[in-house]
């Protein structure tokens, strides 16, 4: 479309608008003047201005009613409960021994040695038969003023004996001709019963003082390893030590006799693993390297099994004894050639010579190096006699001068064996001193102990007979 017509149409619209204005003006009434009338103002009405002015309205503050602020609610923070590690049970106290006394014992009396029986003419050749009690009582000899009684018989071969708090006699016993065995107990009427087992080659036994808890030495196996076991009153058997040296011979040289010392510790004798150290080597200073803990007496904490060497240089400490002052004694079975049977008075950290016996007549033994200091024997015992059990007399039945004397069983069937001998420790310094026979006529006496009534009780290995020696006065 041409531009001109658009412009022309616009002009026409403007002209129309102007015409309408003139029309309304012409139609107004004649003579009246048009006036603006003010809008009446409302009383107390607010006045509005172009820019509003803010007039603050005071709103009264609310009356504060105190509200108790609640105590903060403690939301526990979760802390994991600690894992309870049981505190170790307090170590049980060691029961120490009350020193024995001979108060009330008979007055001192001279003691003559036991006589010797005829060795022939019995029901079974050299000795009475096992069940010939009358024959045995005729054969067994004791000093004047004493007499022997038959107490009972253990089955099998007893090794060592001790009394319990119940007044009964307990023994380690080999069963059925083997090295296996158990603990047996002999009642007051002489009957026996099996108390605890099984053990391999059970040997020593000792009650912890003031308790019915029994400790037993034995082997772990027949040919290797020795140890100590605890037997609780309910029959539970628990190993205390199971790594001790063992076993030179089938029936010997293993963990042997047991005894509780005055300090409450348990002592055990441990035999050597050789006859005279021939399988050992020497260090540069000449000391023979024996296996750890062999040929020694060990001191054991009975509750934990911790132990150390108390004394050493003892080839085969078979049994231990304790006197009224707390001094320990040990028997020692010597070499297979017969040399070295002796009684020793033990001291802490002492060395008693084995295997350095070249200067004592053993040509196969080692020479003692200068670095080793040894203590002498208390008493030498007859060659090949094989001392086994030993006890210190601490009862009050025998005369007072026998208190703290030692009684030793000489086991072997040699001229000066098969008997119990008495040793007075106060007389041994006399160069002419010799042990005195106290019980003769036995076949294989293996152990001896003091009974609750103060008599001495000895047990024989072959038939298991138990004999009591009573003082008549």
Residue ranges with predicted function:
Residues 27-118:
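Ser/Thr-rich, Proline-interspersed low-complexity disordered segments
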Residues 99-144, 272-308, 315-316, 320-436, ...:
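Beta-propeller domain segments
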Residues 151-155, 194-199, 241-250, 309-313, ...:
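Surface loop/turn motifs at the tips and blade-to-blade linkers of beta-strand repeat domains
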Residues 161, 205, 258, 317-320, ...:
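Hydrophobic core register within WD40 beta-propeller blades
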Residues 166-167, 210-212, 263-264, 325-326, ...:
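Short coil/turn segments that connect the beta-strands within blades of beta-propeller domains
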Residues 170-172, 215-217, 267-269, 330-331, ...:
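Residue position within the beta-strands of beta-propeller blades
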Residues 181-210, 214:
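Blade-loop segments of beta-propeller domains
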Residues 201-202, 222-260:
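Asp-box/WD-like beta-propeller blade repeats and closely related beta-sheet repeat scaffolds
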């Amino acid at each position: 479309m041409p531009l001109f017509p658009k412009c022309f149409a616009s002009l026409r619209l403007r002209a129309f608008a102007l015409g309408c204005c003139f029309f309304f003006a012409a139609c107004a009434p004649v003579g009246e003047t048009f006036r603006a009338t003010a809008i009446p103002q409302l009383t107390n009405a607010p006045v509005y201005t172009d820019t509003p002015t803010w007039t603050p309205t005071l709103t009264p503050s609310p009356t504060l009613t105190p509200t108790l602020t609640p105590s903060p609610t403690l939301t526990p923070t979760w802390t994991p409960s600690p894992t309870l590690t049981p505190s170790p049970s307090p170590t049980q106290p060691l029961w120490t021994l009350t020193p024995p006394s001979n108060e009330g014992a008979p007055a001192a009396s001279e003691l003559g040695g036991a006589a010797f029986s005829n060795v022939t003419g019995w029901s079974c050749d050299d000795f009475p038969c096992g069940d010939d009690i009358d024959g045995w009582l005729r054969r067994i000899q004791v000093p004047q003023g004493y007499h022997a009684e038959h107490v009972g018989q253990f089955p099998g071969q007893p090794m060592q004996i001790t009394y319990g708090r119940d007044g009964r006699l307990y023994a380690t016993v080999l069963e059925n001709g083997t090295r296996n065995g158990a603990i047996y107990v002999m009642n007051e009427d002489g009957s026996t019963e099996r108390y605890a087992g099984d053990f391999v080659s059970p040997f020593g036994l000792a009650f912890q003082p003031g308790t019915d808890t029994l400790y037993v030495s034995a082997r772990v196996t027949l040919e290797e390893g020795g140890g100590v076991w605890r037997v609780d009153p309910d029959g539970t058997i628990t190993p205390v030590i199971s790594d001790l040296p063992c076993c030179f011979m089938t029936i010997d040289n293993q963990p042997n006799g047991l005894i509780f010392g005055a300090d409450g510790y348990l002592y055990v004798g441990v035999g050597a693993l050789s006859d005279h150290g021939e399988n050992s080597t020497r260090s540069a200073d000449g000391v023979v390297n024996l296996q750890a803990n062999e040929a020694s007496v060990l001191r054991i904490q009975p509750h934990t099994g911790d132990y150390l060497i108390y004394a050493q240089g003892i080839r085969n400490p078979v049994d231990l004894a304790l006197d009224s002052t707390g001094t320990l004694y040990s028997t020692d079975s010597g070499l297979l050639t017969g040399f070295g049977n002796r009684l020793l008075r033990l001291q802490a950290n002492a060395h008693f010579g084995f295997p350095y016996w070249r200067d004592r007549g053993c040509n196969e033994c080692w020479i003692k190096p200068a670095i080793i200091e040894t203590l002498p024997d208390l008493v030498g015992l007859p060659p090949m006699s094989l001392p086994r059990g030993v006890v210190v007399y601490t009862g009050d039945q025998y005369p007072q001068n026998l208190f703290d004397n030692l009684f030793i069983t000489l086991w072997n069937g040699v001229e000066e064996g098969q008997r119990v001998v008495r040793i007075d420790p106060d007389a041994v310094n006399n160069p002419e001193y010799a042990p005195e026979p106290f019980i003769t006529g036995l076949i294989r006496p293996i152990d001896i102990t003091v009974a609750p009534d103060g008599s001495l009780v000895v047990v024989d290995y072959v038939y298991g007979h138990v004999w009591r020696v009573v003082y008549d006065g």
